[in-house]
Every structure is written in structure tokens, then in C-alpha cells.
């Protein structure tokens, strides 16, 4: 490095930028583009452009006489918080939030980037903002940045164009961190910076400056403009796809929430229900998040923005009213939702850093908040619901200010679960917005249990204070609607149960379960009462919920009143009062699962009330369950009321609830260490799971089934109740009227098939099923009678097709059943008209198509195709496609004549004596003896026969050769994988053992040594194959393993095809991986092979025809015209195969 330096202070983020200490004249400066810092005496080692403009003008006074390493803490998420001895943050006391929380300009990200990319690539002549101003996008959108390793420094172009920069050392930012001094300022009039900051930001640059910067960038770094454009387009495509998917999902959710809120709420409420407020907050969230503008480099305007002045001016902004509840059905913006989660995680990360030292310091910022902070708290909730947790806790600390023992820092820390990993507190980032409050309450109680001295002190607080607090909770609780009150009581009970002391006996656990059952019954009773019309605000609900939770836990004997019920202290609160023990984490998790089941049960009751849940259809079952719960609760009520005076024991009890709701097992487990982490709560299923009333095995209640299980298996297809069979039959009768004498031959049956709604080439099966094969025609009466019976008994295409084509009283298709259908295709399809002059080819083409059908469709290898196999295949769709496609070679599945031509030519080359059978020696000559002799022996041993067919010893028919050729050339096909697995499974146990693999690899080694190639030792090869296949059971490779690994073709070629094995060894491994990952509609290996071989065969035939034509011209000395030459060559090409064929046998003769 050329420049000398004395000190470098850096925070690493996505762009590897740094913060420079300007006390020194020279410093090593790392940046990501063309840098403008050369004039300041700072050397830059990377080409950079305008990223560090603001860094050169950071006030130096902030860094004097301070430990810069503690001021700038590098962090993975771009978070750095100044703690300990430095109460002020690095940038004028403002904390830095998660990267990406930057202020965007008013133009759309994709529009600006698209216009700029087009301008830079020369597609447009000028770049203007007028076009962007007239776009249909929203005026204020947050761009979404995609993080990619390959997009490290090239993405500066997008940031340059869109004003989207990192906060991590490049530009100052601020946010709503709970530990910062920002909250010391009045927050009562917070609002968005939509208009003011936007206009302020747009004054800092103009169109000419932006175009100039674009030109400078591409002049300096023009060699990579193509790469930049490609990466930009990739990112824009990804953003648009994600935006569309996320928008559709949000739109559906919002529409559902909006409908339920409007139907259940009151139209005269000035403040809607919590769901409505939630939706409004989601739509308006972007407007209320504070963002800082980033200034483009301007001459004379390089000073940083005074953040303190900006914050002081914020209270003057007025709060804009909420928009209607999605009257236009517009969901929240995708960027808003993403930004919300980003800022949330950043806020959590800072608290995580602060909580590393829970006992070393106390937060005093809460005490400086004014007492009249109710409005500010409400505004804060409206602006950002994620910050509600922190502010609510602070508000409660104000209410309990005389209680000096509980500090605000302790309350902040109660929001997290203690983990053992790394000795630090980890965050549960999987919390959902809807379930957030309930989980938060659980965590508050957990932490309060860890500090029992605070709770003890609070119990000793003055009685007037307790009464006042109880009134606050009672007042807010009374105003709740019934539905919301149910959820609040659920969370109160849930938090109360979490304080259950695990040192209690089995009897105490029974009492707890009884309380839960009683609570479920009370919730169900409350649902029968009319819903209250009075709705409270979202802040009141959440605030009263959290306040009541905290205060009721701290004062167990206080009573809570509500219009629904009086919640009296239960047995578990007495247990807490008596024992005062710390709750064991494992039993807490078990109880949490029980409580979540109760919540699911309550949710199902709500849906039952609104006729939306599954219980609304099973009211008889619900009645039985409720009677069981009521009886059990009354029977054990006296047990719950009995006082608890036992001391804590050394062992704790764990409750295990089985699927049978009558049995509960109690297991005693040794007490774990206090540091044992709490396991994550189990995810509750959507269906309700009623808990057991009492752990008595003899009280078994067998609930009878209230409804019959509906039929779900239809072997002949699902009946269509909407179809009108008589109307169809009348149309068929009318169609027969147009036919002479109302007698249709096989050619007229095409019209009848279309009237029946069937593909054209169903006409031959219909003709045969109606008895036309015997008489040569079909009458209207016979066909209508047959079709009426078919419609009544068969309801889908697969079952109808098998009924038409199969033998009488047969439910499956055999090979000979396809002959009439395929013969009709050969006779009538326009792509096979040339076969009329070569009838000897008909049987061979039909045989090939039949074998290809069974190869693909008959996955059971039974030799009989069932309706299930027809449904799973694409045969009926391909058959219907014959009607539309005139070129039959375009239908590569089953019917391609080119594929038949390739198969038969390959067979003809191996069949030296032309007896239509090939021997083992003949097959070994295929592809220059590429296949090993041992695998060929296995083929001729009968390992791959289908159904009841018997392998003729030492002979392979043409039908068997079709299976061999397709399997050899396409080892990725599922049938091919099973074909070769059967061959390699010598002992037939369904597993390829190491001995079988070694048996086949030995011959490969011998052949490689004969060629002068040193083979890989079997042990090393075996390790490679096991890594390739990754079998489920070590040392045993099954058919399922090979079908799952998607590399079966390499596995098989390694053991019995030397030529392809060597090709795989010499091929680029990255190309192999690319083939594996490519799931697009690529042609199969068989399609590629058939196309290449057909081109080769046609070229050979053409060369032979030209040679023969030249020889005839030499003898006659008469030149032939081009037309005569073309006609002769076509005749030779079409006649070449019949000359090879000789006398062909029919399918029946085989």
C-alpha cells in the first residue's frame, strides 16, 4: 500500500465501506468504486464512485479523545451501538438501525433502474424524470435490495441511480431503538416525512447530475457494463416476481380480515376493531417510518444533515388520518412489509447487545419521559406496532414508579427467553404478529419468576396503589368486546398458568388441568351471549392486556372484574404464593403446549359461532365433549379448592398427554440445572385438541361418530351430478339421423365420437364396443344402449377408455387390446399415409407403439394397464393430440414414426440372420460392445420380463429389444432405472449389495486394464457411488434410492457400460451438476438419441441413393434432371427399409 497511515477505523458491511478519522492527513481508504477522496490526501485502492461523499465531512469533534473501536462496533447485521461510557451515538446521538432502512426518493425503484439501464446500454437517447413522474406507480415506494455474493460491488450502480445506500458507515440514520436517547424527546405528534423530506431530497440533485454520474460510471468502468446490466435485470426480475407473489398473498389475507371485521364490528365506531387497526397500520406503515435522505454529490452542498434539528422539527408535522379499510382492495406494499421486518430485527439486535450485561447498568431514559405520554404512546403504536412492546413496558414502569426495586431495564429484558448457547440471550425470530402479545406475556412472567425478590417487594407496596392499579385494569377490561375479552382472558390464564411451580405434587397438576377445563367451559358459555357493541381502541386493548398481566401476576390475590365473569385466584396462584419457587423450564414448555391447545380450542369455538369452523358441522360431538368437561370439572372442584401446604420437592413432574384424551401419564424426572434452555413451544394444529378432564383411566368416554365418513375412493371416476346424460343421448340420436340408414361405419364414427365429447381416435374402440366389428356398421339403437350403460357405470375418461377397449368383464388392458386403435391410427392419420404402400410395416409400427405405451404407462410391470396407471400417465392426452397434429413425428411420445425407424434399423443391424430374434452374441455387438457381458447375461436370464411372459432361452424378440434400447439410451427414465436395477439385483432381494456391485465392476476393471487404463480401486469407487446415491441405509442401495438421487445414469454406466463411464469421467463435473439441477422442459436422453440417429440414418440413405444414381448415370451416359433425381432418391429411401425387412410376422404370431 502506497499511503502511510496512523489509524484506520472501519465497520464492514455489504459494500465493504469504512468510516475515516479525519484527524490524520492520510489514511488507507477502502471503497467500492471511483473515489473522489484523492483531493483530500486519502488513497483509494479500488475503483469507486461517490459512495464516501458524506464520510469526508463527518464532524471531527465527535471522535476526539474517545475509543473509536468502542464507538463503531462492527456487526454482522450492520448494527453498532455505543454503550457503556459513551451515552451518545456516533452520529449526533442517533442510533444506527439495520442496514437497508434508508430514505428512498419518490420515484419507483424499478422505473429508475430500468430507465437508467436502458440509457447506459444505448437503448434510449435521453434520461428524463418526466416520464417517471407520469408513471402509475405509487409516489412513495421503498426499493428492495437483493443481497448476493456475486453482486458485491456491481450493485453500486443501482444504488447510485435509486438513492438507496447503506447506513452502515456511509450515511447517518436514525430509528426507534428502545435504548437510545431519541425516546427522551416528546413523541406525541410523530408523523411521516412524506412531503417535507421528499421535497428536501429532490432539491439536492437534478436530472443533469444524475445523467452525468451515469456517464462517468460507464466511462470509467465500461468494460463491465454488460455484466452490470445483466445483474440489474436479474435483480429487477426477482423483485417483480416476489412482489407479485407477496402482493397476491397479502391481498387475500387482507380481504379475509376486512370481511370478518366489517361483519362483526359496529358501523358507528369511531375507532375500528383491532383487526381493522392492524390492517390500517400495515398500509400506512411506510409513511410513518422515519428515513434520512442521502445527498448526491453536489458542489457546495457536502455538509451532513443536522439530525438534531430534523428531530426537533418533527412534532410540527400533523398526523394524517387513516385511509378507509381497503375500499379499493389495495394491499400493503411489498417493500413496506419487508422494511418492517428489517427494522424489527435491527431493533432486536441492539437490545440483544444491551442485555449481555443485565446487572451492570440500569436505564434511566424511561424516567425522563413526561407523565402525559399517553397520546405519544398511542401515536407510537399507530406509527410502528413493532415498538409497542417497549413503550408499553415503559409506560407500566411509570405507573409503578414508587416500586423502586423493579427497574426499566429488567422489564426490557423480560421480553426474551434465556438460552444457553454462547452464554448470551438469543431471540425468537419466528414470532408472528398475531401471536406476538401472548408469547410476550409468557416471557414477561418467565423473567419475573427469575427475579422473585422483585415480586415479593411489589406485594408489600401500599394498598391504595394496588387498588388503583386494579381499577385501571378493570376499567380497560370492561370496555372490551366479548370476542376480544375472550382472548384477553385466555392470555391472562395462560400467563397465570406459567407461574405454576413444578415442585408441587401430582395432585397440584391435576388441579391445574381442572382449572383449564373449567376455563374452556366458561369461554364456550361466553360465546353464547351477544357480542358487545362497544369497541375500544387497539392501544387500549394491548395496554390493558399487558398492564393487567403484569399487575395480576405481581399481586396474586387481587380480583379482576368483567361483565362476563369474575376471575378469582385459582389453585395455581396459591401454589405460587405458598412455594415461591422458580419454574422449571422443561415443565413450562409442557404447560405451554397445554395452554396453546386451549387457545386453539377457543379459536375453534369462535369459528363455530360464526359458522366457519369444523365444529359448526359437528355440534353433536361438541355437545359430548362439553358434557364430559363439565362433569369432570364439577367432580374435582373440591380438590382444586383444597389448600396447598407441601414443600417443594427435589424432583419435578412432567405431564405427557397422549392422543387418547382420557389417559394422562405422570413421569418423575430429575431436576435440571437452572440454566437449561426452554425448548421452543410446539406448533399447535389447526384442529382443536380438547384436553383430558381428569387423569383417571377408568373414566373412559367413548364418543360415538356423529357423522359417517364420506366416500373418497371412486375406481370408476367421481360421478358428475351436474351432467345431463339424457341430453347427450339425444344429441347422439340426432347425429345418427344425419347418417344414411342410421348405420355408421368406422369412418362415420368420428362424428359420433365428437358428439359424445371424446377425442377423434376413440372411434375405433367405440365401433368395436357397439358390435360394429361383426356386422361392419353400428346402429343408433345399439350405440345408444352401449353409451347409456357406459355413462351410468364409468365417470372419467380413463375408466371409459378401458371399458371401450378391454375385453368383456375385464378391468385392464393387455397388449393385443391396442391393435384396433393403432390400426385405425395407421390407416387414417395424415402423417402415416405413406404406409399405405407398405402394409408390411403396419404390424411392426404397431408393435413398437404398443411396447412404448407399456414401457411408459405400465409402471407395475404386470403386463396389464389399469385405470389408475392410465390416469397417472399422459397417454390419453397424447392420443387426443393426434387429432390436432398432422406431423406425427412431432408427437415424440409413443407415436413418432422417426423413433420407430431408429429402433427397427438398430434391430435389423444386430439381427444378422433376419429371423426377427437376436442372440446374446448379437446383442453384445450393440454400440461396439460397450455393454459388459455380465449385464447381457442378466438381460437374457429373464430378469426383465413383464407379466407372465417367459424369456425364450438365448433369444430376444423385437418387443424385448424396444425395452432394451430405450433403457440403454435413457437411464434417467423411471422404467429404465427399474430395468437395470432388476438386472443388477442378482439374488433378487431388492437390494444392491456390495458383492453385487463388485461382481459387475470386476469386468469393467479387466476391460480398462486391457485398454491400458488404470482402474480406480473398488473401495474408492464404492465410496464415490455411496456419496452419489446417498442410500437411506448404509451399505444397501435400493430402487427408491436410485430413483431419488437423480444420478442413476452415472451409477449404472459405471458398472456395465465402459464407453459411457469413460465419458462421464472426462466430463466437466459442473456440467453434470447443471444437468441435475435443470428441471426445465428439456428433451429426454431418448429423444436426443433418436433425433441424432435418425439424422445419421437419413444421411447414410441419401449417400447410398446418390451413389446408386451416379452409377446408373455412368452406365447410361444420360444426365438426369433434378426433379427426376429427387423422385428416384425418395423412392430408394422409402424402399430401403422394406428391402431389409423381408417377411414380417404379425403381433399375434409373436
Curated annotation (Swiss-Prot):
Cystine bridges: none
PROSITE patterns to which the protein is assigned, alphabetical: EF_HAND_1, EF_HAND_2
UniProt GO BP: eye photoreceptor cell differentiation; negative regulation of canonical Wnt signaling pathway; positive regulation of canonical Wnt signaling pathway; positive regulation of protein catabolic process; protein dephosphorylation; regulation of canonical Wnt signaling pathway; regulation of cell migration involved in somitogenic axis elongation; somatic muscle development
Biased composition range(s): Pro residues: 676-693
One Pfam entry name: EF-hand_7
Tissue expression: Expressed in heart, brain, placenta, lung, muscle and kidney.
Domain EF-hand span(s) in chain numbering: 758-793, 972-1007
Gene Ontology CC annotations of this record: protein phosphatase type 2A complex
Keyword Repeat: yes
Span list, region Disordered: 661-693, 1105-1132
Domain of life of the organism encoding this protein: Eukaryota
Keyword annotations: Calcium, Metal-binding, Repeat
Molecular-function GO term, any one: protein-macromolecule adaptor activity
Job description of the protein: The B regulatory subunit might modulate substrate selectivity and catalytic activity, and might also direct the localization of the catalytic enzyme to a particular subcellular compartment.
Subunit structure and binding partners: PP2A consists of a common heterodimeric core enzyme, composed of a 36 kDa catalytic subunit (subunit C) and a 65 kDa constant regulatory subunit (PR65 or subunit A), that associates with a variety of regulatory subunits. Proteins that associate with the core dimer include three families of regulatory subunits B (the R2/B/PR55/B55, R3/B''/PR72/PR130/PR59 and R5/B'/B56 families), the 48 kDa variable regulatory subunit, viral proteins, and cell signaling molecules.
Protein name: Serine/threonine-protein phosphatase 2A regulatory subunit B'' subunit alpha
Native species: Homo sapiens (Human)
Protein's gene: PPP2R3A
Amino acid at each position: 500500500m502506497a499511503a502511510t497511515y496512523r489509524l484506520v477505523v472501519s465497520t464492514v458491511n455489504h459494500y465493504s465501506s469504512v468510516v475515516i478519522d479525519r484527524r490524520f492527513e492520510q489514511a488507507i481508504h477502502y471503497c467500492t468504486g471511483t473515489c473522489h477522496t484523492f483531493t483530500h490526501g486519502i488513497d483509494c485502492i479500488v475503483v469507486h464512485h461517490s459512495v464516501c461523499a458524506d464520510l469526508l465531512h463527518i464532524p471531527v469533534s465527535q471522535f476526539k479523545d474517545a475509543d473509536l473501536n468502542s464507538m463503531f462496533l462492527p456487526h454482522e447485521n450492520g448494527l453498532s451501538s455505543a454503550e457503556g461510557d459513551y451515552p451518545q451515538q456516533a452520529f449526533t446521538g442517533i442510533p444506527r438501525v439495520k442496514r437497508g432502512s434508508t430514505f428512498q426518493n419518490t420515484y419507483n425503484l424499478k422505473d429508475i433502474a430500468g430507465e437508467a439501464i436502458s440509457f447506459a446500454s444505448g437503448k434510449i437517447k435521453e434520461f428524463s424524470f418526466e416520464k417517471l413522474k407520469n408513471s402509475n406507480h405509487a409516489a412513495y415506494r421503498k426499493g428492495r435490495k437483493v443481497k448476493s455474493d456475486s453482486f458485491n460491488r456491481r450493485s453500486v450502480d443501482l444504488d447510485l441511480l435509486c438513492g438507496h445506500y447503506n447506513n452502515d458507515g456511509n450515511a447517518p440514520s436514525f430509528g426507534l431503538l428502545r435504548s437510545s436517547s431519541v425516546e427522551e424527546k416528546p413523541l406525541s405528534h410523530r408523523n411521516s416525512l412524506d412531503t417535507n423530506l421528499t421535497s428536501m431530497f429532490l432539491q439536492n440533485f437534478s436530472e443533469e447530475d444524475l445523467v452525468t454520474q451515469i456517464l462517468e460510471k460507464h466511462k470509467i468502468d465500461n468494460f463491465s457494463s454488460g455484466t452490470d446490466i445483466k445483474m440489474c435485470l436479474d435483480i429487477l426480475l426477482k423483485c417483480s416476481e416476489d412482489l407479485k407473489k407477496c402482493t397476491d398473498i397479502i391481498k387475500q389475507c387482507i380481504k379475509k380480515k376486512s370481511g370478518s371485521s366489517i361483519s362483526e364490528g359496529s358501523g358507528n365506531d369511531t375507532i375500528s376493531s383491532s383487526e381493522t387497526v392492524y390492517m390500517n397500520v400495515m398500509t400506512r406503515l411506510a409513511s410513518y417510518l422515519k428515513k434520512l435522505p442521502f445527498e448526491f454529490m453536489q458542489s457546495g452542498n457536502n455538509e451532513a444533515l443536522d439530525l438534531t434539528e430534523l428531530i426537533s422539527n418533527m412534532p410540527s408535522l400533523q398526523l394524517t388520518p387513516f385511509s378507509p379499510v381497503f375500499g379499493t382492495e389495495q394491499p400493503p406494499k411489498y417493500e413496506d412489509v419487508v422494511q418492517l421486518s428489517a427494522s424489527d430485527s435491527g431493533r432486536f439486535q441492539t437490545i440483544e447487545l444491551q442485555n449481555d450485561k443485565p446487572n451492570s447498568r440500569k436505564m434511566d431514559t424511561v424516567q425522563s419521559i413526561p407523565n402525559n405520554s399517553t397520546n405519544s404512546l398511542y401515536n407510537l403504536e399507530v406509527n410502528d406496532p413493532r415498538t409497542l412492546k417497549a413503550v408499553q413496558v415503559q409506560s407500566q414502569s411509570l405507573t409503578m414508579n414508587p416500586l423502586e426495586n423493579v427497574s426499566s431495564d429488567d422489564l426490557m429484558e423480560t421480553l426474551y427467553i434465556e438460552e444457553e448457547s454462547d452464554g448470551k440471550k438469543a431471540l425468537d425470530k419466528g414470532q408472528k404478529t398475531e401471536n406476538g402479545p401472548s408469547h410476550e406475556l409468557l416471557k414477561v412472567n418467565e423473567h419475573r419468576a427469575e427475579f422473585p425478590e422483585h415480586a415479593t417487594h411489589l406485594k408489600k407496596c401500599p394498598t391504595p396503589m394496588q387498588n388503583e392499579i386494579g381499577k385501571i385494569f378493570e376499567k380497560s377490561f370492561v370496555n372490551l368486546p366479548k370476542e376480544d375479552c375472550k382472548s384477553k382472558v385466555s392470555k391472562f390464564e395462560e400467563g397465570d398458568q406459567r407461574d405454576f411451580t413444578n415442585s408441587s405434587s401430582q395432585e397440584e397438576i391435576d388441579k391445574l388441568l381442572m382449572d383449564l377445563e373449567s376455563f374452556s367451559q366458561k369461554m364456550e358459555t361466553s360465546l353464547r351471549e351477544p357480542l358487545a357493541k362497544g369497541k375500544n381502541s387497539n392501544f387500549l386493548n394491548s395496554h390493558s392486556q399487558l398492564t393487567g398481566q403484569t399487575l395480576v401476576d405481581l399481586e396474586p390475590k387481587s380480583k379482576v372484574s368483567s361483565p362476563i365473569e369474575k376471575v378469582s385466584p385459582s389453585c395455581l396462584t396459591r401454589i405460587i404464593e405458598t412455594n415461591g419457587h422458580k419454574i422449571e423450564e422443561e415443565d413450562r414448555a409442557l404447560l405451554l403446549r397445554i395452554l396453546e391447545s386451549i387457545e386453539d380450542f377457543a379459536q375453534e369455538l369462535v369459528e363455530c359461532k360464526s359458522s366457519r369452523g369444523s365444529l359448526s358441522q359437528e355440534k353433536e360431538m361438541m355437545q359430548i365433549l362439553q358434557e364430559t368437561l363439565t362433569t369432570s370439572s364439577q367432580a374435582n372442584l373440591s380438590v382444586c379448592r383444597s389448600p396447598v401446604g407441601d414443600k417443594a420437592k427435589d424432583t419435578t413432574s412432567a405431564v405427557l398427554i397422549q392422543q387418547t384424551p382420557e389417559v394422562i401419564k405422570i413421569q418423575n424426572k430429575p431436576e435440571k440445572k437452572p440454566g437449561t434452555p426452554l425448548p421452543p413451544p410446539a406448533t399447535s394444529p389447526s384442529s382443536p385438541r380438547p384436553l383430558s378432564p381428569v387423569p383417571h383411566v377408568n373414566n373412559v368416554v367413548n364418543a360415538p361418530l356423529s357423522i359417517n365418513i364420506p366416500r373418497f375412493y371412486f375406481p370408476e371416476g367421481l360421478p358428475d351430478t351436474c351432467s345431463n346424460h339424457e341430453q347427450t343421448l339425444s344429441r347422439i340420436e340426432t347425429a345418427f339421423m344425419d347418417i344414411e340408414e342410421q348405420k355408421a361405419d368406422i369412418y362415420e364414427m368420428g362424428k359420433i365420437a365428437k358428439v359424445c365429447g371424446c377425442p377423434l381416435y376413440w372411434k375405433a374402440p367405440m365401433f368395436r364396443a357397439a358390435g360394429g366389428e361383426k356386422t361392419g356398421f353400428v346402429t343408433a339403437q345399439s350405440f345408444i344402449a352401449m353409451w347409456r350403460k357406459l355413462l351410468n357405470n364409468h365417470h372419467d375418461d380413463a375408466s371409459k377408455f378401458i371399458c371401450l377397449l378391454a375385453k368383456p368383464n375385464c378391468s385392464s388392458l393387455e397388449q393385443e387390446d391396442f391393435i384396433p386403435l393403432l390400426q385405425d391410427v395407421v390407416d387414417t392419420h395424415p402423417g402415416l399415409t405413406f404406409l399405405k404402400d407398405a402394409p408390411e410395416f403396419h404390424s411392426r409400427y404397431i408393435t413398437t407403439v404398443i411396447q412404448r405405451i407399456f414401457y411408459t404407462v405400465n409402471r407395475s410391470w404386470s403386463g396389464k394397464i389399469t385405470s389408475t396407471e392410465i390416469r397417472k400417465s399422459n397417454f390419453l392426452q397424447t392420443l387426443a393430440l393426434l387429432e390436432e397434429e398432422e406431423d406425427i413425428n412431432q408427437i415424440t411420445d409413443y407415436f413418432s414414426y422417426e423413433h420407430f425407424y431408429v429402433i427397427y434399423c438398430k434391430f435389423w443391424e444386430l439381427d444378422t440372420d433376419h429371423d426377427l430374434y437376436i442372440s446374446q452374441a448379437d446383442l453384445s455387438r450393440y454400440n461396439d460392445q460397450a455393454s459388459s457381458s455380465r449385464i447381457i447375461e442378466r438381460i437374457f436370464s429373464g430378469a426383465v420380463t413383464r407379466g407372465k411372459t417367459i424369456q425364450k432361452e438365448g433369444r430376444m424378440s423385437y418387443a424385448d429389444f424396444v425395452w432394451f434400447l430405450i433403457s440403454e439410451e435413457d437411464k434417467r427414465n423411471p422404467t429404465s432405472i427399474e430395468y437395470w436395477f432388476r438386472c443388477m439385483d442378482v439374488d433378487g432381494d431388492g437390494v444392491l449389495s456390495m458383492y453385487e456391485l463388485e461382481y459387475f465392476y470386476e469386468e469393467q476393471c479387466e476391460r480398462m486394464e486391457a485398454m491400458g487404463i488404470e482402474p480406480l480401486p473398488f473401495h474408492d469407487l464404492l465410496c464415490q457411488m455411496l456419496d452419489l446415491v446417498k442410500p437411506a441405509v448404509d451399505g444397501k442401495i435400493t430402487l427408491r434410492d436410485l430413483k431419488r438421487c437423480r444420478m442413476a445414469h452415472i451409477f449404472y454406466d459405471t458398472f456395465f457400460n465402459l464407453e459411457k463411464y469413460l465419458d462421464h469421467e472426462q466430463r466437466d463435473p459442473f456440467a453434470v451438476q447443471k444437468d441435475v439441477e435443470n428441471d426445465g422442459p428439456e428433451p429426454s436422453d431418448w429423444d436426443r438419441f433418436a433425433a441424432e440417429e435418425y439424422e445419421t440414418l437419413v444421411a447414410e440413405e441419401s449417400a447410398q441413393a446418390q451413389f446408386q444414381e451416379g452409377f446408373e448415370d455412368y452406365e447410361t451416359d444420360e444426365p438426369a434432371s433434378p426433379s427426376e433425381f429427387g423422385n428416384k432418391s425418395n423412392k430408394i429411401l422409402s424402399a430401403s427399409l422394406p428391402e431389409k425387412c423381408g417377411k414380417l410376422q404379425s403381433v399375434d404370431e409373436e
